[in-house]
Amino acid sequence: MGGNKQRWFSFHQRSSSATTTTLPQHKHDETPPEFLCPITGFLMSDPVVVSSGQTFERLSVQVCRNLGYIPDLLDGTRPDLSTVIPNLAMKSTIFSWCDRQKVDHPRPPDAAYVEGVVRARMDKDPNPSPGQSPGPGDKDPEPEILPPVEENSPSDYDAVMEAIRARSKNSMSPTTSLESVTIGQSSYHPVRAVSMFSSSTTSSSSGVFAGADSPFRNAMSFSSTDHSSSPMSPEEEEIFNKLRGTDIFDHEQGLILLRKMTRSSEDLRVSLCTDRILSFLRSLLVSRYNLVQTNAAASVVNLSLEKQNKVKIVRSGFVPLLIDVLKSGTTEAQEHVAGALFSLALEDENKMVIGVLGAVEPLLHALRSSESERARQDAALALYHLSLIPSNRTRLVRAGAVPTLLSMVRSGDSTSRILLVLCNLAACPDGKGAMLDGNAVAILVGKLREVGGGDSEAARENCVAVLLTLCQGNLRFRGLASEAGAEEVLMEVEENGNERVKEKASKILLAMRGGGGGESEFGENAEAREWNRMLEATGLSRTQFQGGQNGGFAYSSQF
């Protein structure tokens, strides 16, 4: 791999003909290292995310799987190559970078060459692979990778959403068989889509999934295991027979039936989340028929309510499709998609993948601009859960989330939920710096001065929690807080608030006055302790929190 001296080359320059294409030469430090395949060191033409989170050239992963080799990366780790998901956001970014650099887009590498590179690495690898990664033709099921995660937090959602929060499911062994499905080419009258992005906005996935020979569908077959011969239940067979035809009316009826069956039955959600049904849902989710798209999106939400379905749905390639619908689908479909991304983001295993595939920015746009209140509320909850991991916090900050969220707090729009996202962002250095630069202290102090509103108590407590996170280990906070008149407001909160708020306000005042509270009181670990304490006070934890406080937060659709 060459350590830090990686370079990328265009494979199409290796031609036996007299005509060759010459590209401008670049220094290795001009190519962002994340654009290079860790195995070959070349610019990726078809990047994919593997199960362990790294991004590789698809062909590199395929060759490693075929040879039963798991490479040792520069950081000393060995990736899990058992499943791949197309990284369309990375592909779009690489192509945009090539356009700016005025060079051709990278072409797929030569298979024989990549195999030679991998075999050379195998010969030089001092340690054998810890185990053989299953090849595309293997029939053995993938190992279980999901530990049980409790989801027993209180909720004020409807019966559908309450079901997921009341259940604690066992681990799952995800499989991701993808079958090619072609929708009949009958005439139609497309409905007007409600676009949430301007024409100048770069899309990471739009337009990729329109046809049956979509690159996405063909690419995903690499990680599939064929289960088409497995027996069908009577319910699945009834739905399957309607979805497999070419008549749009049959598609609508099949999706309505699937949506109805999975609305309240936990057992049917599990039994109907099969590779066959998911394959049809992928195709129908991008339909230009209003009812087809809406019912497909609602069906995805219903299936995602069961914990053991969450990773399977993400691994089956739904996230890029959901993002497309969130950007340009109908209003009702956007509501369901926001709810689906929220539901899928509850699973820790999905958080990184959803962020990598480009969901953060569309969710932020939906939170700010969607015509649907339900979509905005579920987008906020999805962002909260995604921002529980550091990489997504960084993505949110880079997407300009801080000024957007602070503006919404100032205007009083979805304040309590947005404050939860801000508290997560304040826990990372970039987020804390952006918030302090964005006048967050004065805005939050001003919010504390306000009285009234249905969720004012929750917003009040969350404001204090964000201020506590901002004050920890930051020398700028004291001056900004004094300038905003925070001491007087916090003293009033300390006097009149509940016990949790009083404790937090006291610690902020102590930090402002420069007394006590050294690193042990306001260090890095203290931030996590205080934030967890705030959520646990209502019977929740950071991983369990579903957004329901004081009975005023439920906006998810009836699915």
From Swiss-Prot:
One annotated GO molecular function is:
ubiquitin-protein transferase activity
The residue ranges flagged as biased composition, category Polar residues, are: 12-24
Q: Which keywords does this Swiss-Prot/TrEMBL entry list?
A: Repeat, Transferase, Ubl conjugation pathway
Q: Identify the stretches annotated as ARM repeats.
A: 266-305, 307-346, 348-388, 390-427, 428-472
What domain of life?
A: Eukaryota
* Chain segments carrying region Disordered: 1-30, 121-156
Pfam families hit by this protein: Arm (PF00514), U-box (PF04564)
Q: Which GO terms describe its biological process?
A: protein ubiquitination
The broad enzyme category this protein falls into is transferase
Q: Where is the U-box domain?
A: 30-104
Q: Which reaction does it catalyse?
A: S-ubiquitinyl-[E2 ubiquitin-conjugating enzyme]-L-cysteine + [acceptor protein]-L-lysine = [E2 ubiquitin-conjugating enzyme]-L-cysteine + N(6)-ubiquitinyl-[acceptor protein]-L-lysine
Biological or metabolic pathway of the protein:
Protein modification; protein ubiquitination
Q: What is its EC number?
A: 2.3.2.27
Its biological purpose: Functions as an E3 ubiquitin ligase.
Report the protein name in the record.
U-box domain-containing protein 41
Where does this protein come from, organism-wise? Arabidopsis thaliana
Q: What gene does this protein come from?
A: PUB41
